Amino acid sequence: MSSKFHTYDIEEMTPTEIYGEVLTQMGKAREEIVTLTADLAKSTKTKKFASELPERFFNVGIAEQNLFGIASGMALAGYLPFVSTFAVFASLRASEQIRTDICYQNLNCKIIATHSGLSFGQAGTTHHCTEDMAVMRSFANMTVIAPADGYEIANAVIASADYPGPVYIRIGRGFEKSVHRHHDYGYEIGKAVTLHEGSDVTVIACGTGVLHAEKAARILSENRGIKVKVIDMHTIKPLDQQAILNAIDETGKIITVENHSIIGGLGSAVAETIAESGKLCHLKRLGVPDSFSGVGHPEELQKYYSIDTEGIISAISEMVGETPEVDKETKVALNDDWKNVV
């Protein structure tokens, strides 16, 4: 992938700020790119684009349905709209406009949805978004991406500009740590990335779950000899089904991890692939259960719903026939700083 737009400092910028930087650099290079938001330029980090390319930045006010209607019109006029708002507003409040105005016409419109999953923890259920992947992947023509970190956000945004049709990219609030060491690891929309090889069990994760899965795999390998294959399934639709089929053949045990409801998201997509393959596979889905999410810091909520490192370790241990309780040695390893482990 071209490094032309990778001008950010991964150590100094949050993942969401990286999105804003990359989008601005792309806008300077491509006159057809426009950015739209609904009074959330500061929160979605599109303020830099607004400052440096004001003639191609459009703030429609707090009117998300109009936001996507306007974006569809601009796409029809030959522009390349990047639309930024909170995931909950894009996928729920404006779902009809995205479905009918954008997806039905298969318009070249890119949606960057921030504050997804449980990342806006203290704001509570009204601002959490654990349903967006389920909604968006049900729309015909829509591509759905859940990047793991700042590097992958940059790669996804850059790749989406040349990827035909509607694209939905969900990112967090912007405080997530990095899992990749650099941007040049062979990112491609629709192609999973294997981060860790293993023969006992496979963990397929997206978004914030990827770092936790990688940490869990390393801890279990070093402390208990459990070999875990970790797959970064950044693209939820189109899904890399071959990667799943290979994992079934290699381990026969799969755990999915997502900062999303277990209904309709990554876990459901993987389950559908397994069911249609006719292959035997032990599957467990980790995510938010069939309930509305609670209120708390994102880290607390991830722990509560067992989508943190400890929760993944427990699920892996149980699946391979060991006690799900995390022993003292493993707890010590959990306290280590595993930033940039890949």
Language-model-derived ranges and their functions:
Residues 1-170, 175, 186, 329-342, ...:
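Thiamine diphosphate
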